[in-house]
From Swiss-Prot:
Alphabetized InterPro entries for the sequence: aa-tRNA-synth_I_CS, Gln-tRNA-synth, Gln-tRNA-synth_Ib_RNA-bd_2, Gln-tRNA-synth_Ib_RNA-bd_N, Gln-tRNA-synth_Ib_RNA-bd_N_1, Gln-tRNA-synth_Ib_RNA-bd_N_2, Gln/Glu-tRNA_Ligase, Glu/Gln-tRNA-synth
Keyword terms of this UniProt record: Acetylation, Aminoacyl-tRNA synthetase, ATP-binding, Cytoplasm, Ligase, Nucleotide-binding, Phosphoprotein, Protein biosynthesis
PROSITE patterns hit by this protein: AA_TRNA_LIGASE_I
Protein name per Swiss-Prot or TrEMBL: Glutamine--tRNA ligase
Superkingdom classification of source: Eukaryota
């Protein structure tokens, strides 16, 4: 609860009562503001005026480096910094000059200290600006953009008071144009504005709300918003809030720039213990996209520090997926490339008293408040001998670890740097029986590769302190770690452990089952890489976690396939139709456009014979209101043929079911136009078609409230339907795995790798957009 004294102090500084109460809820901010006010009061020896108070509040709200706060408070209290513009310049200066001492002469020059802008100077600058635009002003009068005059005058007088400039602009414009007339009060027509808004909508950033995305596809870097727009330039790591500066920082950054030439460097560092999923696609796009947008480079680095969980197939699959998405790594590296250097640095930490060998068991280190290690203060000479013994295999797994002496953001004390593992490594064999942890490896590999922007998902925020601490403890270049929100999808699970459970339960076939959202599964289902990249771009990069609807990803898929997938015709539930008056003694060759909306993309031929097959759902014995397809007394057109068929006879099987139809045909232009045209096949290929739906029935299958029985109890029994006797036109006969088609009126389909000579297997990628008028 706010104390009366504190509330009075903050309102006395110029804060509204609501703002003061809000500030008091933030203990760190209110403490800093109280300290700043106390210092200012000591300097002034009197009550702090509101203008000074507002600047003090602005200062403590924006400055995270408390070392410089006292320095700037003294300038504010002494009225050397007395405008918001000067304060912004001062904050930028101290961020750009992190090392003491500050060059006060240079600082004051950059912040306009002592600069006095007279009313005469303001009058002269405004007059010069108005003279420059006088003809346009006289023509447009008060419809002229007065902000332009303000901006140019302020540019000429950087430290002038903004209100004084505005008053002078208003006065001189009034003197030039006179009072506003009736015509000046008429609002501008909105036509031009509407056109501008229409253009803006086509290029503006998409807005993500409640899992919905609006707007057109832009590149991922055009979608960057929020904190990502404030990334530091290479070599200016110290400008990042929270970045730790040591006496060695500036020299190390100078060396870093000499090595990189100021180049942006990012990395995508997956663990090779599973298959990449849709969330990784965002990480790939962000890391590779940011580097590409800034003419930089991106490493693909495998974090191979867990030998018992790593398999060769995962290395291959990860690399394949990165390149499938269209990215080429600058270099493929492995954490194991640096094992020798990492070990040498671990020894250095022990020498410096910053790491020790501990014998607590894994179970003792778990939980929120594990007991402190009784070996934390053992002599470093002893830890050196024990660490060497660990390396030589003299401890069993779990008997000894190397721990670093620090406390992380989440309160975790002394994270493990090395542990004993006797599993042979896929690259180093049995050279090592101790392996570094993620907390130890990650930042040091970034340092070795001179990464400028270490982009991680939000769960790694708790490890940022160990990231900075370790680089600084070893006096090596320290990159900047920046965390962003993960991308999740409804109706999906992406956890490696849970996917393994799905496979073990027989719910899916493997990691690439098209019902999953692993990248290999999406590729098998037929999702184009461009669509996945577009989806990531639409979602954008924010600090907040994002959970999206699958239909938004599917919309991106349709956008790409509409222009990329040639058309074909297929029938899932065939009904034989015999044309009794077929107009030719042999089949006709029908020329079908690959893309009906753009016939310049070519044609293919399909046979049209006296026997065709249509969808059983495209026939009803008796027509109904609103029904437009084939029925008794209701003819229907056959797409692309130029013919209309009309029912003559229904042939039934022994069970009474309709077995085939006998129809007559006529030219479409020889009579009344039919209500509808349907797709068909003739002399077709028999194929297998797999139809996919959501794997789970609820949006959040992992939510114990929504699904009390666990995600395995939420499986959708209709998630896969196999149509074994489907028919498809012969234009697809030479299709290869992953070739994609639009089957007219049905959806987009991709050739599955299970296809073999004699039978093609198709996966339905996505349905067509729903047509409310189709009955």
């Amino acid at each position: 609860m706010a104390t009366p004294d504190s509330l009075a102090l903050f309102t006395g500084l110029g804060l509204s009562e609501n703002k003061a109460r809000e500030t008091l809820k933030n203990e760190a901010l209110s403490t800093q503001l109280r300290e700043a006010a106390t210092q200012a009061h000591q300097i002034l020896g009197s009550t702090i005026d509101k203008a000074t108070g507002v600047l003090l509040y602005d200062l403590v709200s924006r400055l995270r480096d408390t070392r410089r706060r006292s320095f700037l408070v003294s300038y504010i209290a002494n009225k050397k910094i007395h405008t918001g513009l000067q304060l912004s310049a001062a904050l930028e200066y101290v961020r750009s000059h992190p090392q003491d001492p500050i060059d006060t002469k240079d600082f004051e020059q950059e912040c306009g200290v002592g600069v006095v802008v007279t009313p005469e100077q303001i009058e002269e600058a405004v007059e010069s600006t108005i003279n420059k635009h006088q003809l346009q002003l006289l023509a447009e009068r008060y419809r002229f953009n007065m902000g332009l005059l303000m901006g140019e005058a302020r540019a000429a007088l950087r430290w002038a008071d903004g209100k004084m400039i505005k008053n002078e602009v208003d006065m001189q414009v009034l003197h030039l144009l006179g009072p506003k007339m009736e015509a000046d009060l008429v609002k501008k027509p909105k036509v031009a504005k509407a056109r501008l808004e229409e253009t803006d909508r086509k290029t503006a950033k998409d807005v993500v709300e409640k899992g919905e995305v609006a707007g057109q596809t832009l590149s991922l870097m055009e979608q960057l918003r929020g904190e990502a727009l404030k990334f530091h330039k290479p070599g200016e790591n110290y400008k990042t809030p929270g970045y730790v500066i040591t006496p060695y920082t500036m020299d190390l950054l100078k060396q870093h720039l000499e090595i990189t030439g100021g180049q942006v460097r990012t990395r995508f560092p997956p663990e090779p213990n599973g298959i990449l999923h849709i969330g990784h696609a965002k990480a790939i796009n962000f890391n590779f996209g940011y580097a590409k947008a800034n003419n930089g480079i991106c490493f693909l680095r495998f974090d191979d520090t867990n030998p018992e969980k790593e398999e060769a197939k995962f290395f291959t699959a990860i690399y394949d997926m990165v390149t499938w998405l269209g990215y080429t790594p600058y270099k493929v590296t492995y954490a194991s490339d640096y094992f020798d250097q990492l070990y040498a640095w671990a020894v250095e930490l022990i020498h410096g008293g910053l790491a020790y060998v501990c014998h607590q068991r894994v179970e003792e280190l778990k939980g929120h408040n594990p007991l402190p290690s009784p070996w934390r203060d053992r002599p470093k000479e002893e830890s050196l001998l024990l660490f060497e013994a660990m390396r030589k295999g003299k401890f069993a797994e779990g008997e000894a670890t190397l721990r670093m002496k620090l406390v992380m953001e989440d309160g975790k004390m002394d994270p493990v740097a090395y542990r004993v593992k006797y599993t042979p490594h896929h690259r180093t064999g049995d050279k090592w029986c101790i392996y570094p942890t993620y907390d130890y490896t990650h930042c040091l590999c970034d340092s070795i590769e001179h990464i400028t922007h270490s982009l991680c998902t939000k769960e790694f925020q708790a490890r940022r302190s160990s990231y900075f601490w370790l680089c600084n403890a070893l006096k090596v270049y320290c990159p900047v770690q920046w965390e962003y929100g993960r991308l999740n999808l409804h109706y999906a699970v992406v956890s490696k452990r849970k996917i393994l459970q799905l496979v073990a339960a027989g719910a899916v076939r493997d990691w690439d089952d098209p019902r999953l959202f692993t990248l290999t599964a999406l590729r098998r289902r037929g999702f184009p890489p461009e669509a996945i990249n577009n989806f990531c771009a639409r979602v954008g990069v924010t600090v907040a976690q994002t959970t999206m609807e699958p239909h938004l990803l599917e919309a991106c898929v349709r956008d790409v396939l509409n222009d990329a997938a040639p058309r074909a015709m297929a029938v899932l539930e065939p009904l034989q139709v015999v044309i009794t008056n077929f107009p030719a003694p042999k089949p006709l060759d029908i020329r079908v456009p690959n893309f009906p909306a753009d016939e310049t993309k070519g044609f293919h031929q399909v046979p049209f014979a006296s026997t065709v097959f249509i969808e059983r759902s495209d026939f009803k014995e008796e027509s109904e209101p609103g029904y437009k397809r084939l029925a008794s007394g209701q003819p229907v057109g056959l797409r692309h043929t130029g013919y209309v068929i009309e029912l003559q006879n229904i042939v039934r099987g022994s069970s009474g079911c309709v077995e085939r139809l006998e129809v007559t045909c006529r030219r479409a232009d020889a009579g009344e136009k039919p209500k509808a045209f349907i797709h068909w096949v003739s002399q077709p290929l028999v194929c297998e078609i797999r139809l996919y739906e959501c794997l789970f029935q609820h949006k959040n299958p992992e939510d114990p409230v929504e699904v009390p029985g666990g995600f395995l109890s939420d499986l959708n029994p209709a998630s896969l339907q196999v149509v074994e006797g489907a028919l498809v036109d012969c234009s697809v006969a030479l299709a290869k795995p992953f070739d994609k088609f639009q089957f007219e009126r049905l959806g987009y389909f991709s050739v599955d790798p299970d296809s073999h000579q004699g039978q093609i297997v198709f996966n339905r990628t996505v349905t067509l957009k729903e047509d409310p008028g189709k009955i």
